[in-house]
A protein has these predicted regions:
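Nucleotide and nucleotide-moiety/phosphate-recognizing core
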Residues: 43-128, 136-158
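Residue-level detector of flexible, active-site-proximal loop/helix-junction positions
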Residues: 23, 90, 115-117, 162, ...
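Positively charged, low-complexity intrinsically disordered leader regions
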Residues: 1-52
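Unusually extended, aromatic-enriched hydrophobic runs near protein termini
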Residues: 25-26, 81-84, 202
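Conserved active-site and cofactor/substrate-binding residues in soluble primary-metabolism enzymes
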Residues: 11-14, 29-41, 67, 94, ...
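YjeF_N-associated NAD(P)HX repair module
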Residues: 2-15, 121-205
C-alpha cells in the first residue's frame, strides 16, 4: 500500500465533523456545495487513476456519505459515463435526498440492492457508510460490502472504506477492500492506524 499524501496531523471523526459544521454554519457554505466539491474530487481522482470506466457502479447508503456518491453519479453522467447507483436505503438524510435529486436530474439509473446482483465490468464506488460508522454493521450493508469485495473490480472508497472505524482503524466484521480512498477535510486516524492501511489502498486528500 502507498499513500499519495502523508499528513502531519490525524483527526478524529468528531474533529472532522466539527470542521464540517464550522464550514456550514460559520462560513455559511451550504452542505450540498460541500458535497459537490467532494464528489468532484472523487470523480477527478478516479478518472486520473483508472481512466474512464465502461460502467461506474456506485453503492449508496442513507447518510451524507451516500450524498457524495449521488453527486459522483450526476457528475459522471454529465461526462457521458454509463453510471448506475445501487441503493441500500430509501430513508435518506435531507442532504442525501437533495443529492439524489441532483442525480435524478442527470438521468442516473437507480437500482435497488439485491444480494444476487452481478457487476462484471467497470469500477465500483463505495459510498455506503461514512465516518459515523462505529462497528455495528447492519444488513444488507454486510452483504453489499462482501459483494463489492468479491467483484474483482477496481474499488474506490468515498472518504473512508465502509466497515472501517474512522478513529481506530478497526474492522469489526467486514470492510471494503479499496484500491483508492479519496478523503476530505482532514486525514482520519483510522485510515492510517490499526487495520486501516490494509483496506484503504492509495489515500488522496
Amino acid at each position: 500500500m502507498s499513500h499519495n499524501l502523508i499528513q502531519d496531523a490525524l483527526f478524529s471523526a468528531k474533529s472532522v465533523a466539527e470542521l464540517d459544521r464550522i464550514a456550514i454554519e460559520q462560513r455559511q457554505i451550504p452542505s450540498l456545495v460541500l458535497m459537490k466539491r467532494a464528489g468532484r474530487s472523487v470523480l477527478t481522482e478516479l478518472l486520473e487513476t483508472f481512466g474512464p470506466p465502461s460502467l461506474l457502479s456506485i453503492f449508496c447508503g442513507s447518510g451524507n456519505n451516500a450524498g457524495d456518491g449521488y453527486i459522483v453519479a450526476a457528475l459522471a453522467a454529465a461526462k457521458n459515463i454509463q453510471v448506475q447507483v445501487i441503493e441500500l436505503s430509501q430513508n435518506l438524510s435531507q442532504d442525501a435526498s437533495s443529492a439524489r435529486n441532483f442525480a435524478a436530474e442527470a438521468n442516473v439509473c437507480f437500482v435497488p440492492f439485491d444480494s444476487s446482483l452481478s457487476i462484471e465490468e467497470g469500477i465500483i464506488v463505495d459510498s455506503l457508510l461514512g465516518t459515523g460508522y462505529l462497528g455495528n454493521l447492519r444488513q444488507p450493508y454486510g452483504e453489499a460490502i462482501q459483494l463489492i469485495n468479491d467483484s474483482g473490480l477496481p474499488l474506490v472508497a468515498v472518504d473512508i472504506p465502509s466497515g472501517l472505524n474512522a478513529d481506530t482503524g478497526h474492522v469489526a466484521e467486514v470492510a471494503v477492500q479499496a484500491d483508492l480512498t479519496v478523503t476530505f477535510i482532514g486525514a482520519k486516524q483510522g485510515l492510517f492506524t490499526g487495520q486501516g492501511p490494509a483496506f484503504c489502498g492509495d489515500i488522496i486528500l
